Each structure stands twice: as C-alpha cells, then as structure tokens.
Design a protein with these regions (language model features):
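Multi-pass alpha-helical transmembrane bundle typical of ion/small-solute transporters
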Residues: 1-303
C-alpha cells in the first residue's frame, strides 16, 4: 500500500511540475535560440542538473529543516520514512506552519492569474474576473487577514507562516514580472551567452518555487519531491529542446495548471488547520483538473 501511495504521489508530482513549468519552458526555448550551440548544450546539461538536484532537492529539504530545526539536517531529509516517534511528532507539530505558508503562496498565485494575467479563457467565469482586475489586491488582502486571524487562534507561528507565504509570493512575482522585459533584451544577440545562462537560471529558480511549494500538498517527503519534481524538470527540458511548438497548441494547459494550484493551495491551508485530507486527494485533484483542460485544449485545436 505504501508503494502504491508513493507511486501515485510521484506521478502527480511529475504531472504537476511538467504542466506548471510550461511558461518556463517557453522562455527557455526563446532565449536558447539566440545562443551558440556550445552554450545551449552547457545550459541543457549543467542547468538541468542544477535545476533537478539543487532547486528541487536542496530547496524542499532546506524548507523542511527550517520549519523543523529540532530534527537536524539528516532527519529533515528522511523524516517521512523515519520510525523514530520523536521525529514523527516534530514533523506533525511543525507541518501546519509549512502547509499554511505554502498554501497561502499558491492561492495568491492563482488569484493573480485569475484577475490580472492575460490568458486563453477556458471557463466563462474567467471573463468576469479578468474585467475586475483592480480587485486583486483587495481580495488577497482580505484573504490574508482572514487566514491570519484564524491561525492566531491556533498557533501564532501559523499566522507567521501565512505572512511568509504572502511575502514570498510578492517577491517571486517581482522577478517574474521583470522576466518578459529582460527576455526582450536577451533576445539581442549582442549580449553574452553567459549573461543569458545566468538569466535563465534565475528565471528557472523563480518558476521552480511554485512547483516546490505545490509539492508539499502531495507529500512532506523530500526524496519523493526530488524524484517527482526532478523527473518533471527533465521532461520540461525535453519539451524545451524538441516539442515547444506542439505544447503551445494546448492553449488551456496553463488554465489547468492554475486551477490545480488553487486546489493544492486550498488543500494545504485546510490541512494546516487540522482537517485530515488523505494523501491520494492531491494527485487525484491534479489528474482530474489537468485532464479536463488537456481534453478541452485538444478539442479546441481540432476545431
């Protein structure tokens, strides 16, 4: 049963990481076209290793260790497989802080897309919210106030976690907002390939935070996150190399990724307040939502 649960979790992580990184793959492909062959190969090899082992391995491990410093670096890596009751108790007591922070980040990310970002409209209601963009900051401010108010009743550290999650959103959003402008500059062949590689690494790191935080809705196991998100990152690199134009044809994949992010963020916030949600729920929610928008994209392409 544990093996089946781990398999479903990893499969969900791979799918979520792949689809949520499509925008990143498109930026990578556009910039790589302006680089020399040697620089492209360097980025696709060493950049991938950095993305897989550092961002999707070290970052979730560092987050778990920061949230539960008492268990130490080794137990932070293997905590979910540990039989030590002290380690399991420490994880259980501290996980709400991680869950509420990551959940707040993801919910903010969804509402920013819903209210402010240009999109292919996959659902009729998206037209309404796109016309109300001015309300984005009011909505997330009220939402954060509500989450913090409820969290303070349980644990002040949970409230602090929610604030950290919202701060992380606005910091990473600043990097993403600058990405399009910087991409236009980097398309100029006069800039060095080293500058372009450094830019791509920064952008990849920024985009990866969504996937890393979303992964905690599936599991707190760092090895499973590394495996699932790592394979997803490799798939994204392959898409960058050979299939980016085909992926662009699936116009509603981004919609699916964002609704999945809403689902995962909501699960994390609810779970942080002590409502037990089975581990299989996050993968199933991801499969169903992404499957729906994949089919919708397929039908739109044929039509």
């Amino acid at each position: 049963m544990l093996l089946l649960s781990s398999f479903i979790t990893v499969a969900g992580l791979i799918l979520f990481e792949t689809v949520s990184s499509v925008d990143n793959a498109i930026i990578n492909a556009e910039v790589l076209r302006t680089m020399q062959e040697k620089a492209r190969r360097w980025f696709l090899l060493w950049g991938m290793l950095f993305a897989v082992f550092f961002i999707r391995g070290v970052l979730p491990w560092a987050i778990v260790w920061a949230v539960v410093p008492a268990i130490g670096p080794i137990d932070a890596l293997t905590a979910t497989f540990s039989s030590d009751p002290k380690v399991l108790q420490a994880i259980e007591q501290s996980s709400p802080v991680l869950l509420i922070g990551g959940g707040t980040f993801l919910v903010f990310l969804f509402f920013h897309w819903l209210f402010l970002e240009p999109k292919n409209y996959g659902l009729k209601i998206e037209h309404f919210f796109a016309a109300q963009g001015v309300w984005f900051y009011a909505v997330v401010s009220v939402l954060l106030t509500l989450i913090v108010w409820l969290a303070l009743k349980r644990d002040p550290m949970m409230a602090f976690g929610a604030v950290i999650g919202s701060s992380a959103f606005f910091i990473t959003h600043g990097f993403k907002q600058n990405a399009e402008e910087q991409e236009r500059k980097l398309m100029d062949r006069g800039m060095s390939d080293i500058s372009k590689i450094l830019y791509l690494e920064v952008i990849d790191t920024t985009f990866s935070i969504d996937g890393v935080l979303g992964a905690f809705a599936f599991t707190l196991s760092v090895p499973l996150i590394l495996l699932g998100n790592g394979i997803g990152a490799i798939v994204v690199r392959q898409i960058t190399i050979s299939n980016i134009e085909n992926i662009k044809k699936y116009i509603y994949l981004k919609n699916g990724a964002m609704y999945s992010i809403l689902g995962l963020g909501s699960i994390m916030v609810i779970d942080s307040f002590g409502v037990h949600i089975p581990e299989w729920v996050s993968p199933v929610v991801t499969f169903v939502i992404l499957g729906y928008f994949f089919v919708k994209s397929k039908l739109a392409h044929k039509g």
